[in-house]
Each structure stands twice: as C-alpha cells, then as structure tokens.
Amino acid sequence: VLLGLGLNRLFGPMGILGLTPLAVITAVTNSNGAIYTALAKEFGDNTDVGAIAILSLNDGPFLTMIALGTTGLAKIPILSLAAAIVPLIIGMILGNLDEDFKMLLSNGLAMLLPFNGFVLGANTSLFTIAKAGAGGIVLGLITVLFTGVLTYYLYSLIRRKPDPMGMAIGTTGGNAVAVPASVAMADPSLEPVVGVATAQVAGADVITAILSPILPGFFARRAAKRQQKN
C-alpha cells in the first residue's frame, strides 16, 4: 500500500512505466485463497489452514477500497465498503453457528484441493503476461517480494522458527482482476486507469501463481538444511 501511495505521490494516478498505483494496491491487497489453502495442507499446520477464514477478508475489493480511501487516492462511499464486506461476514457467521456443518465442510477440504488446482490452471493463460507487458511482470514480482518474502520473515520472527507459509501470502487472487472496475464504480475518477490496471493485475495473477507454489518449498528445504547443520 505504501508503495502504491508513493507511486501516486511521485508520478500521479498514471504511475510510471505503465505501472499504476491502482494496480499495485489491488495486487498486493488481494491474495489467492486456493493457493494458500493447498500450500497450508503441505507446509503448514491446522492454524495455517484455519487462517484462510481471516485471509478471505482480502479476497475482493474491500481492503483495496480501504487502502485507497484512507490514503486519499479515491473517494469510497461507506455503502460501497459495506457491500464489499457484509456478504463475507454473513458467510463467516453462518459457517460458525453449526459445529456439525463446520465438520462437514472441513472434511471436504481435501477433496476441493485438486479441483482448485484444475480451475486455477484452466484460467491461467501465459498470453495474459504478454498482454500485461513489463508492468504486469514487475507487479507480480513486487507482490511476491513485498507480501511473500517480507511476510515469511515476519512469520518466522513471530513464531521463532522458519515458517514457509509466509511465502504463501505472496499471491494475487484471480478475482482481483475485477477489483479495479469495482473501485472505479465507487469512484469514477479512476475510470481512465481501469483498463491498464486490470491487465497488469491479471499479469501479476499469473506470475504469482507460477512462483508461489515453488518458493515455500525452497524456503522449507533451506530451513531443513540449516537445522541439520545445527
């Protein structure tokens, strides 16, 4: 968010080299829940799997609207914020009211993972990278670096042990592609940058989908080697 704010302050809403503040903030405030869930089953524990409920808050335009509104980059009406978050809150409440219902859904998690992978792969196009250009590639790398690598070291510091699940946050969710248009509906002044921001976010989605499943394994192997030496 600070990176997007600095980009806007220095170069305005059109950004630099085609990389717009709207695209940056959208990409880094939306993660891919399907990738995180799959990686949590392999590299994490029950707390990591359960964290997806909280991480779902950044799936969609809510946090992007909060970031843009609080930094003054956009004027977001309260009703738009409510429309973005209320359905998710209702779903979280309903999912926690019935313990049997909760168990039913939790047991089905393993069945969902292969289908999540199929859907992710079917909707990932390398042509998207070409369309997004250098801006989309750079945005994907920024997302991995600023949300993945930094979160890895933060998680490791808090838990006092190497935690590869921090890298699983460094993704851009597929539904983030629709966020620039959603934000522009709340603040029409952003309409001129919606097209380029959408293409860049789509490019970042593909780049992070490729890198994110690889990097947690790399950090996990590196941590294991260090433990063996000690």
Task: Report each predicted region and the residues it spans.
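Hydrophobic core segments of alpha-helical transmembrane domains in multi-pass membrane transport
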Residues: 63-70, 87-96, 114-122, 143-151, ...
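C-terminal ends of transmembrane helices
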Residues: 34-44, 92-105, 150-160, 213-221
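Loop-centered beta-sheet repeat module
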Residues: 47-97
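Alpha-helical membrane segments and immediately flanking helix-loop junctions
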Residues: 7, 11-59, 161-199, 203-206
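Interfacial helix-loop-helix linkers and transmembrane-helix boundary segments
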Residues: 13-17, 45-46, 99-109, 124-138, ...
